[in-house]
């Protein structure tokens, strides 16, 4: 004899569970690459994308960078020039224009740079941040124009220019037009030098390729975040070429600091204070806005 179906347990209850089931967001937790520890996403975001405990520095978006650095309510976005979106009509597995659309939808930016003008520790500054989430922060015409516009803003406002570098190198979809940005950005740095305005570079993870070979290594002062990969060709490529194992930590921020390529490795939480102090010293202006010599005399 077939038992009658229990409608409450077999039909009604499952439907109620399905009705009120809440999907768990995929990005609710962040896994630490060093320890494997799972940390609540909002906790990591509130800590400026540094894993509490291990202090591992995760990649940080350009908007979050500027928000972290500028004094609250003191900064504005600098409008960036428009460029031809796909001058070479490039196509690989996808059309280049489609890759640009995807990157813009993902990041909310037009390209891999964001420029801001405002105050840091009370001092006027122009900041440029590269967005690694936009096609690996690659250097193309738009990024080159953005860097130059940032330098022009610093020249116009007579402020230090601070760059947060994060890039996989030149953008292959733009070919020679991408490589042209290396000398163009170098000329912009030379103009800052001629105007005796500080140019400070913060090397973040990763800073590689054509960006390292141009404006990222031309600063008056080079700071780096802990553990950042800073190189032209990556360690895997070098090992495959020379068929030898590289030293531990090779091309990381601490290794470059030990070998004189980086002036200081600075924790992300100390970057604002460190940069404000450096700019105060280099411009001879105190963080209160008065000339440093006058402040000391007082």
Swiss-Prot record:
Alphabetically ordered keywords of this record = ATP-binding, Cytoplasm, Fatty acid biosynthesis, Fatty acid metabolism, Lipid biosynthesis, Lipid metabolism, Nucleotide-binding, Transferase
Annotated catalysed reactions = N(6)-carboxybiotinyl-L-lysyl-[protein] + acetyl-CoA = N(6)-biotinyl-L-lysyl-[protein] + malonyl-CoA
Cite the InterPro entries for this sequence: AcCoA_carboxyl_beta, Acetyl_CoA_COase_Trfase_b_su, ClpP/crotonase-like_dom_sf, COA_CT_N
Gene Ontology molecular-function annotations: acetyl-CoA carboxylase activity; ATP binding; carboxyl- or carbamoyltransferase activity
Quote the PROSITE patterns the UniProt record gives.
COA_CT_NTER (PS50980)
- Per the UniProt record, one Pfam family is Carboxyl_trans
**What Gene3D superfamilies would the database entry show?**
2-enoyl-CoA Hydratase, Chain A, domain 1 (3.90.226.10)
Q: Where is the CoA carboxyltransferase N-terminal domain?
A: 28-297
Asked if the keyword Lipid metabolism belongs to this entry, the reply reads yes
Question: What are the BP-aspect GO terms?
Answer: fatty acid biosynthetic process; malonyl-CoA biosynthetic process
Q: Its Enzyme Commission number?
A: 2.1.3.15
What Gene Ontology terms describe where this protein resides (cellular component)?
acetate CoA-transferase complex
Kindly tell me the pathway this chain contributes to.
Lipid metabolism; malonyl-CoA biosynthesis; malonyl-CoA from acetyl-CoA: step 1/1
Q: Where in the cell is it found?
A: Cytoplasm
- Quaternary structure, from the entry: Acetyl-CoA carboxylase is a heterohexamer composed of biotin carboxyl carrier protein (AccB), biotin carboxylase (AccC) and two subunits each of ACCase subunit alpha (AccA) and ACCase subunit beta (AccD).
Q: Which NCBIfam families does the protein's record reference? A: accD
Q: What does this protein do?
A: Component of the acetyl coenzyme A carboxylase (ACC) complex. Biotin carboxylase (BC) catalyzes the carboxylation of biotin on its carrier protein (BCCP) and then the CO(2) group is transferred by the transcarboxylase to acetyl-CoA to form malonyl-CoA.
Q: What family is this?
A: Belongs to the AccD/PCCB family.
What's the protein here called? Acetyl-coenzyme A carboxylase carboxyl transferase subunit beta
Q: In which organism is this protein found?
A: Methylobacterium radiotolerans (strain ATCC 27329 / DSM 1819 / JCM 2831 / NBRC 15690 / NCIMB 10815 / 0-1)
Upper classification of the organism: Bacteria, Pseudomonadati, Pseudomonadota, Alphaproteobacteria, Hyphomicrobiales
